[in-house]
């Protein structure tokens, strides 16, 4: 699995066990990602921070 990094032109291969791509952004600025990469379990979103996870690189 390859997930995009914070710089959109680059991607990285996920290590074993981390089989989800994720994107984290502030709810106030949904167009500006704060973090993106590979993760094992999708974190819960909060009032300030939202996570988008999926098993391809399309979501992040």
Curated annotation (Swiss-Prot):
Pfam families (alphabetical): Toxin_cobra-type
Disulfide links within the chain: 3-21, 14-38, 42-53, 54-59
Record localization: Secreted; Target cell membrane
Keyword Disulfide bond tagged: yes
Tissue note: Expressed by the venom gland.
UniProt keyword annotations, A-Z: Cardiotoxin, Cytolysis, Disulfide bond, Membrane, Secreted, Target cell membrane, Target membrane, Toxin
GO BP, sorted A to Z: killing of cells of another organism
Subunit description: Monomer in solution; Homodimer and oligomer in the presence of negatively charged lipids forming a pore with a size ranging between 20 and 30 Angstroms.
Function: Shows cytolytic activity on many different cells by forming pore in lipid membranes. In vivo, increases heart rate or kills the animal by cardiac arrest. In addition, it binds to heparin with high affinity, interacts with Kv channel-interacting protein 1 (KCNIP1) in a calcium-independent manner, and binds to integrin alpha-V/beta-3 (ITGAV/ITGB3) with moderate affinity.
Entry protein name: Cytotoxin SP15a
């Amino acid at each position: 699995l390859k997930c995009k990094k914070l710089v959109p032109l680059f991607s990285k291969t996920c290590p074993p066990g981390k089989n989800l791509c994720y994107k984290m952004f502030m709810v106030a600025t949904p167009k500006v990602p704060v973090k993106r990469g590979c993760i094992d379990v999708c974190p819960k979103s909060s009032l300030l921070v939202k996570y988008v996870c999926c098993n391809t690189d399309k979501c992040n």
